[in-house]
A protein has these predicted regions:
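Short, structured surface patches at the beginning of a domain
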Residues: 1-157
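Coupling/hinge elements of helicase-like and P-loop NTPase modules
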Residues: 3-6, 145-184
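Charged, glycine/proline-rich intrinsically disordered loops and linkers
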Residues: 121-128, 177-185
Length: 185
């Protein structure tokens, strides 16, 4: 790809548009991502190929995404990979797929675009753009870890006051009760 990204002509450049959510319960967020990705591709006149799926951001369960990156890396021409936001790429800075994509960018074969952040990561990206990408991945990882910590604290709190932290096991009844001052109902 060109050395500078200023006023670049992207017309008909192959673009892999990635809309991803972490699990099936978040699927309602996919249409909004898809719309933003398609609008971005239309604006730049990209030859966009939309991939939309639910798959965790953790490396063991990224079968679809790894396959897309493999296909993109074998693509014979330069290409762009577009994610709505950085955390749709990954929350793990050290993952193999991130390393692969960053190497493709270093070679000048790929660019990573994040339209919601106005970030285009390319071979000649300045230090502040590289840092924005890395910080976005770090903060995505932090967000995920913080949610996990909050869930653990909530479970500990429920157990400390004698509440079961979820539904009863199979074979037991889920009985709701209320506490009114000192009286159990």
């Amino acid at each position: 790809m060109k050395k500078s990204n200023e006023d670049k002509n992207y017309e008909n450049v192959k673009a892999f548009l990635i809309a991803r959510v972490s699990d099936p319960s978040q699927r309602e967020a996919l249409p909004a991502q898809e719309r933003r990705l398609n609008e971005y591709a239309d604006k730049l006149k990209l030859n966009g190929e939309l991939h939309s799926f639910d798959e965790t951001a953790y490396k063991e369960d990224r079968v679809k995404f790894v396959e897309i990156v493999k296909n993109a890396s074998e693509y014979p021409q330069d290409f762009i990979m577009v994610f709505d936001k950085i955390d749709r790429l990954t929350r793990d800075v050290s993952s193999d797929v991130v390393r692969t994509l960053k190497n493709l960018v270093k070679e000048g074969r790929a660019e990573l675009h994040f339209p919601s952040y106005g970030l285009v990561y390319h071979q000649q990206s300045p230090a502040h753009d590289k840092t924005r990408l890395d910080m976005g991945m770090v903060f995505g990882g932090y967000y995920s870890a913080a949610i996990s910590d909050n869930v653990k604290r909530k479970i500990e709190q429920k157990l400390s006051v004698g509440e079961w932290p979820g539904k009863a096991c199979i074979g037991y009844k889920n009985v709701k009760y209320t506490v009114d001052r000192n009286e159990l109902k």
